[in-house]
């Protein structure tokens, strides 16, 4: 399956952690097809996350809905299956220069994502351990599908430094942009503000290596955030999946 545009543009950022931004990533016909097949908001297969955490309103993420890969059909299912394959994972290995990457057959953190107007996801570092395989969550991959995105739509992917004192980059979620980043305990990122419907597909790539036991994201507070964000983030790391 050939889905990658031969003329993509790759930018690598090394600080505060390795991030690869690839514009014009998908072949134009592939991109057009996915735009056409994107599920409407009235589709019954969308599911939300936790409204409450330990009896408190979830102030970590709201307005973010996911569509399970197992509920997709036809070309969309073929596309999603392929990006988890070892063949495609090897292509990502070539782009990033990281060897011995393994496709995530469990699809644990994968899916079609839409964030609705007014939604947000607080800053966090991703899960580290894939429980099904025992492998390390090495890379997180996202492709954006936001046609006609404008600055005033917000929905920026914020990148924060290791000690959470500075937002070092704000990446625009323009259509056909792929973002890949290297996971660590301090690969802090989030989407604190969404002012227009925001669409993406996300999945993870694994690797063998030393890793802790944390299999959930760990949310942290920005300097301007309510300190309860960090406190609730620790509780959220212990909550079972809302949908699996």
Locate each region found by the language model.
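N- or domain-start disorder-to-order transition segments that initiate the globular core
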Residues: 1-8
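Non-heme Fe(II)/2-oxoglutarate
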Residues: 8-95
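A structural signal for short, well-ordered beta-strand segments and their strand-loop junctions
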Residues: 21, 102-105, 111, 180-181, ...
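A structural signal for well-ordered alpha-helical scaffolds and beta->alpha junctions
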Residues: 27, 31, 72-76, 85-89, ...
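Non-heme Fe(II) oxygenase catalytic core, chiefly the N-lobe of the double-stranded beta-helix
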Residues: 39, 71, 80-135
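Proline-centered turn/helix-capping motifs that create local helix->coil transitions or kinks
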Residues: 42-43, 99-102, 147-151
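Catalytic core of Fe(II)/2-oxoglutarate
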Residues: 118-119, 126-137, 146-244
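Eukaryotic charged/polar low-complexity linker/IDR segments
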Residues: 140-142
């Amino acid at each position: 399956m050939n889905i990658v545009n031969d003329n993509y543009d790759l930018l690598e950022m090394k600080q505060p952690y390795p991030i690869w931004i690839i514009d014009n990533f998908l072949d134009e016909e592939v991109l057009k097809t996915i735009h056409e097949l994107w599920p409407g908001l009235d589709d019954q297969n969308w599911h939300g996350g936790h409204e409450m955490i330990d009896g408190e309103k979830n102030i970590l993420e709201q307005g973010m809905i996911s569509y399970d890969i197992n509920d997709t059909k036809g070309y969309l299912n073929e596309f999603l299956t392929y990006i988890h394959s070892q063949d495609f994972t090897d292509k990502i290995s070539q782009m990033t220069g990281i060897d011995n990457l393994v496709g995530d057959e469990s699809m644990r953190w994968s899916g079609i994502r839409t964030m609705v107007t007014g939604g947000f996801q607080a800053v966090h570092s991703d899960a580290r351990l894939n429980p099904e395989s025992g492998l390390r969550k090495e890379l997180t991959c996202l492709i954006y599908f936001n046609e006609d995105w404008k600055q005033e739509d917000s929905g920026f992917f914020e990148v924060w430094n290791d000690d959470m004192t500075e937002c070092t980059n704000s990446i625009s979620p323009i259509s056909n942009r792929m973002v890949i980043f290297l996971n660590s305990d301090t690969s802090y990122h989030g989407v604190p503000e969404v002012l227009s419907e925001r669409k993406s597909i996300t999945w993870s790539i694994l690797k063998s290596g030393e890793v802790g036991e944390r299999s959930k994201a760990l949310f942290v507070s920005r300097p301007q955030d309510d300190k309860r964000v960090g406190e609730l983030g620790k509780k959220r790391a212990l909550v079972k999946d809302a949908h699996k």
